[in-house]
Amino acid sequence: MNTGVLSLGVIVLYLVAMLVITVVHGRRKKKASALDFFLANRGVNSILLPLTMIAAMQSTFAFLGSPGMYYTHGISFIVLVLSQVWVALMVVYFGNKIRLLANERGYMSLGDYLEDRFQSRYLKVMAACVSVLMTMIFLAMQYVGNARAMSVVSSGAISYNAAILVSVAFSLLYVLIGGAGGVVLLDAVQAVILLIGIVLAAWVALVPSGGIVNLFTQVRQTAPELLSRPGLKGLYTDKYWVMQFIVLPFGIWLCPHVWNKSLMARDEEALARSAISIPISQILIYGFSTLFIGLAGHILVSASEVRAADNILPILMLKYSNWFVAALIMAAAIAAGISTINAMLLVSSQLVSQDLILLTRRGRISNEQNMRISRIIVFAVAAICGLIALKPPATFVQVIQDVAYTGLAQLAPPFLLGMYWKRCSRLGASVGLTAGIAILFGTRILGVSPLGWPGFMWGFFINIILTVVISLLGKEGEAPTAEVH
């Protein structure tokens, strides 16, 4: 039998096995409420939360985008690992505070917090719209990554479009049957699989390269720009490096499927362990494994074989391992993608249903009606993102970094200033956030970088300045909940 078909069989078998786990878990559950369906009743323990945090943060980007970035730009991309220390600290300090407030005041989203803190429905809707837009872009790209992985490892046994349909169908089943509790359980399994898979992929790449020392020696001789900043393409300038440390960590932490983990945590211990899991997993994946894979691509694969940098890992696996090992590694890549897809699909549907459609009715409809609407929205979000994925951009790395993360980072000023500064006003937060988003999209559409600084930096800091200045100058009284926060 064709090895491509066998490889596809391994992947489908994996997807079915995860579905069996979901069905078994779903049968044990009592009647679901919105809180249970979206946040697992705020009861995820200190074993499952770190694993679901790893799975949520490590998408198909770890297997496709990251090796592609190292292949294209070299070691400068390691700044991603360095910047994630900030994300871990945010989880510990900001995440625990919002967890306590959410337990006390019933928040299910960032929008709930902003509405309560500033007494502003506009901020809630704005936060929901920004979060949904950015997350759905990211979600569509996860479908792209999964489909590419299936298509490449199966040697074309399944078409790209068919692979999209498979990814959409299985993600719908996982989420609709399991809800947040099922997603967390699958995340725990898939986190272990993806970590083992990426290490195995690095080993496959290192063996024909002659080991770590020989790999770096050959790269230094053939493409020394890969081992220094700003990299082979000149991307990692001082200004871009600053963005990676300032804006990107906020954007990653404020991804709704990551931020919501704080609301799922059972206690402070669970949250602390999940914070520790972030740098450990980031170093293992991005500091070592994908670095070796990306650099090995320059030594082992001719440029003519690499149509897109995102495909360097699948190419290496097919070329330097047998079909079964390649299938297992790509199954791990798909595990990374499915775990993120599930979390993003769940949280996007939560934001659309609870913060937008049921904006004024959430407390006035029955639990059955709420769940019916929520499940319809899950289906609709998956369908829309699947359609987007059918005609994707050539590479999804820049879409993720330049739109999704930097757009979500604009939510940081109203959130953090509102939490730690009592004088922060509704008007200041509203104007700052609106201006930040407008500048981000305006500069991107126009393709301009004033004074050489990218638009997302202008948007982020003008957002902060406007929020602070208007709050200081305005005569608007404190929101009644300011003291609480």
Give, region by region, the residue ranges found by the protein language model.
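Membrane-embedded helix-loop-helix hairpins and adjacent transmembrane boundary segments
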Residues: 1-485
